[in-house]
């Protein structure tokens, strides 16, 4: 019986007020996407395994939901939208060289370990900007991230921005083995400065290179940190990455959003497809980033189209948690009306409901049961987000009940 009424571990039902809030937020975010000129795209919930395979550098195989079709092909529930969008763009926009702006919403599925306490199905909304490798494109994506956070109702948040090219250039110069490199990435990701220093001390590096790599976990702060980082290395590729971040910051200032920007040169990702800037949006009330994104100029080539790209995704569950814990209310009005009627006035009730629906009102017809009283319907209405009740007592006697104030007024038909 438990399996009939309960959901599996890692997934949950969303209903009533929570569902209303979630849909409101999704519509707010979608308006931001459209305001910046992005067009909607839908991709399948499942794809061939190769779309998310190791070569793409997305979710580890053990965390994928895999199954077989009747022809024996291995299929995967999408864990990440970006490879799906890259595949679709490579198919439908192969010859397009002008910028392509796409936006999406839907569920993603990651079979994470139970002890991590994460949902295995989450709702993601995001954008992808293809065929544009400019700093302006990077800044546009950052500005959209800020706008999404603001329009969701958040005011106290920050966008942490890094550049994978900075660390990558230093690591390549140091010629670190893959094992050491992976361990160093892990230490930097958790800001373990001392662990990174101990590991690097065993690598027989030049003093300046040792110091630069050692300090990566501590290179976070405002725009001044970029100049500090530049003073640590003469590596051309590393300095180019820093210059790119500085240029992006100047454009973000044109948007008026610089106060939300924070630089973190130790920001790394488990997704290997990132090639340029990488960023995450944080606020109070959730341990996970609400928004994650970055530049992935080589990913589309895996699907046959050589094109630069940048994008981000918003994790709706993290956003909802943050709003709830910060006690931020959303301006959602209870606009539904309950049209309550006795059974002998059903034709009149249907006629009135249709008239009001044609005017754009949300009207639910409810027949007054003989074993109920008016107070039962008032309680039912409040629980189910009705704004008011129109109660047809007789063909010439109608009451309007405001469920927020309790005010009752007679009205004429």
Task: List each model region and its residues.
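Short Asp/Glu-rich motifs
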Residues: 52-53, 168, 190, 319, ...
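Short, surface-exposed recognition loops or helix-turn segments adjacent to catalytic cores
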Residues: 156-165, 184, 262-266
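Acidic, His- and aromatic-enriched active-site or binding-groove loops in soluble protein domains
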Residues: 63-69, 176-197, 205, 257
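Positively charged, Gly/Ser-enriched RNA/tRNA-binding surfaces
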Residues: 21-32, 47-48, 82-93, 102-154, ...
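Phosphate/dinucleotide-binding and metal-coordinating scaffold of catalytic cores
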Residues: 97-98
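Short, conserved phosphate-binding/catalytic loop or strand-edge motifs used
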Residues: 120-125, 161-169
């Amino acid at each position: 019986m438990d399996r009939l009424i309960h959901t599996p571990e890692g997934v949950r039902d969303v209903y009533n007020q929570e569902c209303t809030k979630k849909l409101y937020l999704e519509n707010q975010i979608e308006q931001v996407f459209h305001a910046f000129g992005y067009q909607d795209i839908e991709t399948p919930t499942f794809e061939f395994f190769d779309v998310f395979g190791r070569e793409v550098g997305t979710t580890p195989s053990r965390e994928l939901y895999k199954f077989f079709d009747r022809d024996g092909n291995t299929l995967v529930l999408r864990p990440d939208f970006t490879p799906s969008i890259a595949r679709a763009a490579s198919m439908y926009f192969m010859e397009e060289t002008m910028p392509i702006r796409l936006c999406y919403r839907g569920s993603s599925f990651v079979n994470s370990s139970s002890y991590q306490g994460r949902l295995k199905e989450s709702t993601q909304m995001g954008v992808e900007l293809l065929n544009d490798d400019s700093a302006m494109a990077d800044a546009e994506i950052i500005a959209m991230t800020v706008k999404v956070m603001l329009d969701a109702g958040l005011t106290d948040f920050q966008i942490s921005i890094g550049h994978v090219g900075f660390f990558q250039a230093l690591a390549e110069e140091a010629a670190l083995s893959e094992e050491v490199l992976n361990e160093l990435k892990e230490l930097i990701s958790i800001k373990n400065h001392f662990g990174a220093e101990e590991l690097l001390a065993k690598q027989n590096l030049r003093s300046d290179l040792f110091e630069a790599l050692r300090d990566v976990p501590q290179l976070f702060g405002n725009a001044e940190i970029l100049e500090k980082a530049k003073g640590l290395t003469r590596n051309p590729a590393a300095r180019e990455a820093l210059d790119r971040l500085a240029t992006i910051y100047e454009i973000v200032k044109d948007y008026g959003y610089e106060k939300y920007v924070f630089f973190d040169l130790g920001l790394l990702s488990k997704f290997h497809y990132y090639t340029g800037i990488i960023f995450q949006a944080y606020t109070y009330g959730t341990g996970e980033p609400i928004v994650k994104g970055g530049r992935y100029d080589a990913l589309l080539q895996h699907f046959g189209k050589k094109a630069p790209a940048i994008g981000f995704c918003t994790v709706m569950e993290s956003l909802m948690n943050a709003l709830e814990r910060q006690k931020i209310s959303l301006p959602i009005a209870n606009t539904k009306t309950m049209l309550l009627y006795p059974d002998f006035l059903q034709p009149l009730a249907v006629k009135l409901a249709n008239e009001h629906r044609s005017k754009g009102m949300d009207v639910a017809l409810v027949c007054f049961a003989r074993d109920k009283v008016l107070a039962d319907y008032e309680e039912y209405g409040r629980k189910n987000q009705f704004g008011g009740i129109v109660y047809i007592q007789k063909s010439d006697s109608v009451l309007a009940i405001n469920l927020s104030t309790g005010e009752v007024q007679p009205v004429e038909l």
